[in-house]
């Protein structure tokens, strides 16, 4: 009898331990930028020497052309200017009324207590619904980040991605960016606005005591996972 009771106690403790471990687990956060954040340019093969002064092999940008990114490994400055405002309002107003009346020539004895001395009955009903809701959001992100060309598409567009890390005291901040850039939108100072980048993904995260202070404690996560409400 005691052995069975001890086994049940062990099973209960094991179940509580599993629940506690599930409650303590952190929710995995998938990074928004999935592409590699850097790329190295492949070395070019040395062409045959055709002269003592001028070599006709391609060695970079032409002499009378701007130095703009066009190959894998080239760098580009992204000027982040994101201002997003969204507002949503909704409302519902509905009402319904109904009535029914009945008249009896004679009332059965079994129902005499319900109708007392009257042989008429009426039913009235009404319901109403009124609801409203609203939501608003405003996000502003300004800054610069230098990215690397990862791939040159068939139409000439550039797939870029990059990361910037900044450590301050016990905290670290990460800015990641990826997207597709049209070379025609690149300015003379080798920059492009983030609003002109297709499929742009901008991520700003941090690690440190400030980020930890914004996370829920392990006991709160435990009760949040086991609570049925």
Curated annotation (Swiss-Prot):
Q: Where is the lipid attached (S-diacylglycerol cysteine)?
A: 24
Q: Tell me one GO molecular function of this protein.
A: cytoskeletal motor activity
Q: How does it sit in the membrane?
A: Lipid-anchor
Keyword vocabulary terms for this entry: Bacterial flagellum, Cell outer membrane, Lipoprotein, Membrane, Palmitate, Signal
**Lipid positions (N-palmitoyl cysteine):** 24
Q: Per its database record, what is this protein's job?
A: Assembles around the rod to form the L-ring and probably protects the motor/basal body from shearing forces during rotation.
Matches recorded under HAMAP family: FlgH
Name the chain's protein. Answer: Flagellar L-ring protein
Native species: Cupriavidus pinatubonensis (strain JMP 134 / LMG 1197) (Cupriavidus necator (strain JMP 134))
Lineage, opening ranks: Bacteria, Pseudomonadati, Pseudomonadota, Betaproteobacteria, Burkholderiales
């Amino acid at each position: 009898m005691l052995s069975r009771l001890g086994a049940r106690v062990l099973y209960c403790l094991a179940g509580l331990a599993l629940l506690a471990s599930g409650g303590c687990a952190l929710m995995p956060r998938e990074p928004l930028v999935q592409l590699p954040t850097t790329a190295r340019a492949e070395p070019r093969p040395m062409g045959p020497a055709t002269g003592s002064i001028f070599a006709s092999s391609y060695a970079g940008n032409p002499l009378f052309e701007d130095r703009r990114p066009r190959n894998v490994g080239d760098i580009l400055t992204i000027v982040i200017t994101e201002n997003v405002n969204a507002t949503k309002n909704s409302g519902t107003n509905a009402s319904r009324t109904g009535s029914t009346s009945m008249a009896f020539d004679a009332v059965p004895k079994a129902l005499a207590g319900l109708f007392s001395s009257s042989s008429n009955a009426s039913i009235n009903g009404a319901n109403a619904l009124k609801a409203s809701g609203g939501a608003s959001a405003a996000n502003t992100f300004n800054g610069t980040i230098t990215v690397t060309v990862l791939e040159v598409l068939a139409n000439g567009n550039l797939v870029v991605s990059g990361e910037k890390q900044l450590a301050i005291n016990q905290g670290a901040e990460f800015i990641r960016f990826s997207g597709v850039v049209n070379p025609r939108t690149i300015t003379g100072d080798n920059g492009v606005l983030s609003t002109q980048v297709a499929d742009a993904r901008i991520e700003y995260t941090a690690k440190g005591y400030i980020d930890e202070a914004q996370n829920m404690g392990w006991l709160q996560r435990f009760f949040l996972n086991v609570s049925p409400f």
